[in-house]
Structure formats: C-alpha cells, structure tokens
C-alpha cells in the first residue's frame, strides 16, 4: 500500500491520488496540519523537498514502516 503525504490546495497531490485510482493502487492519504506537522515529516523523510511525498508500507522483522519512494514523477514510474 502506498501512502501519499499531501497538503491542501496541491495540484500535484491531487494528481497523485488520481493516478493511484486510475491504476487501481491501494493508497492512504495523510494531510499536512491534520495528520502530521512539517517538522514531523522532515524528521521521517529528510530528503523530501516538495509535495506530494510518496511512501510505500513495508514490513521489516514484523515491524511496519514507510519507505520513501519520491514524488509524483517517481510515482508515475511505478
């Protein structure tokens, strides 16, 4: 499952959600200011510089984590 870190009024975020819907990819949305703060996001994904931030849920030794994929451009390549 993918996780889309989004923010309000973000056309690229909306495009990422639409792309997932069109491809039939299961995804969850986390919204800035509701589900997380910018500081929390930068702590978890320090290399991310723009929205949306796309992550995939993975399990390592039974622990569920989110692995950074990239942004909309990288999502289009998946």
Predicted regions span which residues?
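Structural micro-motif
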Residues: 45-57
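Short phosphate-engaging motifs
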Residues: 12, 37, 61
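Thiol-based oxidoreductase modules, predominantly thioredoxin-like and allied folds used
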Residues: 6, 25-39
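Short amphipathic alpha-helix with an adjacent loop that forms part of the alpha/beta core around
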Residues: 38-46, 77-78
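Local sequence-structure signature of Cys/Sec-based thiol-disulfide redox active-site neighborhoods
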Residues: 1-26
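Non-catalytic, surface beta->alpha helical segment in thiol-disulfide oxidoreductase systems
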Residues: 56-78
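Residues that form or immediately flank small-molecule/cofactor binding pockets and catalytic motifs
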Residues: 9, 34, 74
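Generic alpha-helix structural propensity
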Residues: 36, 49, 67-70
């Amino acid at each position: 499952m993918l996780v889309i870190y989004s923010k309000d009024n973000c056309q690229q975020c909306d495009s990422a959600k639409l792309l997932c819907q069109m491809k039939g990819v299961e995804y969850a949305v986390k919204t800035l200011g509701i589900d997380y703060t910018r500081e929390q996001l930068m702590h978890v994904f320090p290399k991310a510089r723009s929205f949306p931030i796309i992550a995939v849920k993975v399990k390592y030794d039974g622990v569920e984590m989110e692995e950074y994929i990239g942004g909309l451009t990288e999502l289009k390549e998946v």
